[in-house]
Curated annotation (Swiss-Prot):
Protein's recorded name: Putative ubiquitin thioesterase otu1
Entry keyword set: Cytoplasm, Hydrolase, Meiosis, Metal-binding, Nucleus, Protease, Thiol protease, Ubl conjugation pathway, Zinc, Zinc-finger
Record's signal peptide: none
Reaction equation(s) it catalyzes: Thiol-dependent hydrolysis of ester, thioester, amide, peptide and isopeptide bonds formed by the C-terminal Gly of ubiquitin (a 76-residue protein attached to proteins as an intracellular targeting signal)
Length: 329
């Protein structure tokens, strides 16, 4: 690792900083003090959930032994724990979300008002604000692989590799993934899902969440409903995707709206405080008409040109003809 990218949050200010991998706690503290014009000896640094102190007693300790790139660091002033001698914080789970102090659940039953217009650019993605950053929509290309693209970042595999995992699981578990479940023999389904033109859905979500030991929460734009796949994940991690009827996108905790490199996309599955904000994002998208009514939308098979109405017709057409490329019209 050549450097660490960290999001700093102090009161209503935030910044993303890149520091060398061999940077010490002391040099990082100097950077924070200069960035926010704070006296060095009045600063406390915290990360994780529940928030844990970054020990500041030994300024020569490499920062990389305490935090990971992409994490958020809470900067506090005049904190009693500024120079705590408590046990060093435990290293974070790789790729897990940093979730500093959230209000109690009772305080966020009605999350803050939606923010969706950036003061910097009109091209920022839709987002809602939370106490620790913005939950932003990361839009996937509309290319029939949106589900696999949305899951590629949190799961760490390419869309092609995710399709292969699904196909192999289907073939390896014929008793679970029967013709009745798949709508076709497992061999045919495995061949079909390997194609870039084939849409993924609940079967793929079920398989991938179980395979990776991650809870996948799919939030429906039209209804706000949250469908949870693998709600007791082995890794203790959760990711959120947003479903608009025929399309999947990823919801991320964004350090910078226009920079996806430091997005947080894996969260502690035991903590539900993020969920209401993702639902609020879905509500914002609904108000923007960012959804398709799958029962009545008009769709055309782009292979043969047949006009169809609704998901039911599209599914029947795909099963009857093998055509799996559709577009709205």
């Amino acid at each position: 690792m050549s450097s660490l990218r960290l999001r700093l949050k102090y009161e209503n200010q935030s910044a993303v900083e890149t520091v060398e991998a061999n940077a010490t706690v002391g040099s990082f503290l100097d950077l924070v003090a200069a960035k926010f014009s704070l006296p060095r000896n009045s600063i406390a640094l915290k990360f994780g959930f529940p928030p844990q102190d970054i020990p500041l007693v030994n300024s020569d300790v490499p920062l990389s032994t305490l935090v990971s790139s992409g994490q958020q660091i809470l900067v506090l002033k005049n904190a009693a724990t500024s120079f705590s001698t408590n046990e060093p914080a435990k290293p974070p789970i790789p790729n897990a979300a940093t979730k500093p102090t959230f209000p109690p659940q009772t305080e966020i039953s009605n999350p803050p008002a939606v923010s969706h217009q950036s003061k910097n650019t009109s091209q920022d993605p839709p987002y809602v604000s939370t106490p620790i950053g913005d939950i932003a929509l990361r839009v996937m290309p509309d290319d029939n692989s949106c589900l696999f693209r949305a899951l590629s970042k949190p799961l760490g595999f390419s869309p092609y590799e995710l399709r292969e995992i699904v196909a192999n699981q289907v073939l390896s578990n014929p008793d679970i993934y029967s013709t009745a479940i798949l709508g076709k023999p497992s061999i045919e389904y495995a061949s079909w899902i390997r194609k870039e033109t084939s849409w993924g859905g609940y079967i793929e979500l079920s398989i991938l969440s179980s395979h990776f030991g991650v809870e996948i929460c799919s939030v429906d734009v039209k209804t706000g409903r949250v469908d949870s796949y693998n709600p007791q994940p082995a890794t203790g991690q959760r990711t959120y995707i947003v479903y608009s009827g025929i399309h999947y996108d990823l919801a991320a905790l964004a350090a910078v709206l226009w920079d996806t490199d430091v997005d947080v996309v894996l969260f502690d599955a035991s903590d539900v405080t993020i969920t209401p904000y993702v639902q609020q994002l879905a509500s914002l998208l609904k108000n923007m008409h960012y959804y398709t009514d799958t029962a009545s939308f008009s769709i055309r098979c782009t292979i043969c040109g047949t006009g169809l109405v609704g998901e039911k017709d599209a599914t029947a057409h795909a099963l009857a003809t093998g055509h799996t490329q559709f577009g709205e019209y």
